[in-house]
Amino acid sequence: MVLSALGFALMAALVKVAGLRGFPVLQIIAARALVSLGISWWDTHRKRISPFGQHRKLLFARGLIGFLALMCVYSAVIHLPLAEATILQYTHPIFTLLFALLALKEAANRATLLCIALSILGLVVILQPSTGLQESANLPPYYVFLALLGAAGSGAAYVLVRKLAPLEDSSVIIFYFPLICLPSALVLGWRDFIMPIGCEWLILLGVGVFTQVGQWGLTKGLALYKAGTVVAFSYVQVPLAAMLGLLFFNESLSVTSILGGSLIILGAWINTKDKT
């Protein structure tokens, strides 16, 4: 599970490197999707199942929402400090609950409500500019909004995956994400794409490769350990992101980000712990 967290943290760091080198978000998404599409297609071929599934409208919706969320998340990663962008992504349980309530008629228990309360409190701490502390996050509101929009998209995608899980093979659900992302990114962004030079090819390739490393580690972890243990280990991604931000981008965590991020992660942990 540490491998999974490291994979996702390195993926985010490479997204930031690519963005700072001038690569547009849609080109970074296309590079990731190209790698993921090849691996996902091979996985369905290995299982000897059709990659296109039966419930194509739901599968298409999952892919499209995931694509829109990824645009927001990657934009936030490029323009916000790496640790803060990662912390804001952990607010997705709020949105997962809302969408699950609307789409699946799932009621919230006390642990989930506590998770939401702590997440909102954590957001207030991170975003409050007049805390009286010398070190506040002082994050650009537009990219904070994009990060939260990305978390909302992730929440909606999780609900669709939950709805699709008993209907389709997991490999088919995974396949549709890059299947929608790649053509969407090409159609919307090809005019702005720039030709990579030298090591930039490896940076773009690395985004896709480390995404798969993260996914592989997560899948293996879920197969070997309880879900609560797996998710608890996934929080290692936050200090890893902070360390990578400090080493490669000269970023440091503010006091408000540490306090607010701790509340958000505590809420997510309580929510997960209650379900195991």
Which positions does each model-derived feature cover?
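Cytoplasmic-side transmembrane-helix entry/capping segments in multi-pass membrane proteins
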Residues: M1-L3, Q54-L64, A108-L121, Y143-V144, ...
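Loop-to-transmembrane-helix transition segments
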Residues: M1-S4, T44-C72, P141-G150, M195-V213
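Transmembrane alpha-helices of multi-pass small-molecule transport proteins
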Residues: R21-L68, G153-A157, Y176-R191
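Juxtamembrane helix-entry segments on the extracytoplasmic side of multipass membrane proteins
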Residues: G22, A30, F52-H55, Q128-A152, ...
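Helix-helix packing/entry segments at the starts of transmembrane helices
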Residues: A85-T91, L164-I180, Q215-L247
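C-terminal transmembrane-helix exit sites in multi-pass transporters
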Residues: P93-A117, P239-I258
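Hydrophobic transmembrane alpha-helices of multi-pass small-molecule transport proteins
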Residues: A111-S130, T256-K275
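Transmembrane alpha-helical segments that form core, pore/gating elements
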Residues: L133-F193
